[in-house]
C-alpha cells in the first residue's frame, strides 16, 4: 500500500460556517484548528495547506466554563520596558472586538511557522450573525451536536 501525499493543486478546500452561540471557547477552537489544518481529511499532509476555510459567526456569544469569564487574563506587551498589559476575558467580550477571544484561542492551537500564517488566513471570525461570504456557499457545521460538552449549560 502506498502512502499518499497531497500536492497543493490536488487539495479540495471547502467553506464551513460555525455558529458559536453558546459554545465553549476551547472546544470550539480545537475543532476550528483541526478543520483549518485539514486533519479531519483522510489525505492529510502536514506540510501542505489542505484545510478548509472556516467562518465563525456570533463570536461574541461564546461561553467560558467555571470562573474563566471573570478570571482568565490575556496579556500583551507594548514594546516598552515595563509595558506588560493585561485584560480579562470579560473586558474583551464586552468590548469593541469580542471576536479576538476566538481568534486568539484558535491561533494558539496551531503550530508556528510559514504554513501557520497561511492557514490562519483561512479563518474568518465575526461578532454578529451576518458574514459577507454567502457567495462561497459555506456548509453549516453544528459543533454543539458533536459532543454534549461543547455547549455550555
Curated annotation (Swiss-Prot):
Molecular functions (GO terms): mRNA binding; structural constituent of ribosome
Record-linked Pfam families: Ribosomal_L13 (PF00572)
A single BP term in Gene Ontology: translation
Superkingdom of this protein's organism: Bacteria
Disulfide pattern: none
InterPro entries reported in the protein's UniProt record: Ribosomal_uL13, Ribosomal_uL13_bac-type, Ribosomal_uL13_sf
Coiled coil residues, start to end: none
Region (Disordered), start-end ranges: 134-153
Single GO cellular component term: cytosolic large ribosomal subunit
Ribonucleoprotein listed as a keyword: yes
Keywords: Ribonucleoprotein, Ribosomal protein
Biological role: This protein is one of the early assembly proteins of the 50S ribosomal subunit, although it is not seen to bind rRNA by itself. It is important during the early stages of 50S assembly.
Family stated for the protein in its record: Belongs to the universal ribosomal protein uL13 family.
Description of how the protein assembles with itself and partners: Part of the 50S ribosomal subunit.
Protein name: Large ribosomal subunit protein uL13
Amino acid at each position: 500500500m502506498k502512502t499518499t501525499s497531497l500536492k497543493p493543486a490536488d487539495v479540495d478546500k471547502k467553506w464551513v460556517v460555525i455558529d458559536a452561540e453558546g459554545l465553549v471557547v476551547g472546544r470550539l477552537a480545537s475543532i476550528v484548528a483541526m478543520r483549518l489544518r485539514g486533519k479531519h481529511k483522510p489525505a492529510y499532509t502536514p506540510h501542505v495547506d489542505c484545510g478548509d476555510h472556516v467562518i465563525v459567526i456570533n463570536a461574541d456569544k461564546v461561553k467560558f466554563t467555571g470562573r474563566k469569564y471573570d478570571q482568565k487574563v490575556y496579556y500583551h506587551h507594548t514594546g516598552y520596558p515595563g509595558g506588560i498589559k493585561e485584560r480579562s476575558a470579560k473586558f474583551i467580550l464586552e468590548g469593541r472586538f469580542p471576536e479576538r477571544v476566538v481568534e486568539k484561542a484558535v491561533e494558539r492551537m496551531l503550530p508556528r511557522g510559514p504554513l501557520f500564517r497561511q492557514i490562519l488566513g483561512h479563518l474568518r471570525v465575526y461578532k454578529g450573525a451576518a458574514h459577507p461570504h454567502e457567495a462561497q456557499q459555506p456548509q453549516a457545521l453544528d459543533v454543539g451536536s458533536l459532543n454534549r460538552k461543547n455547549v455550555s449549560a
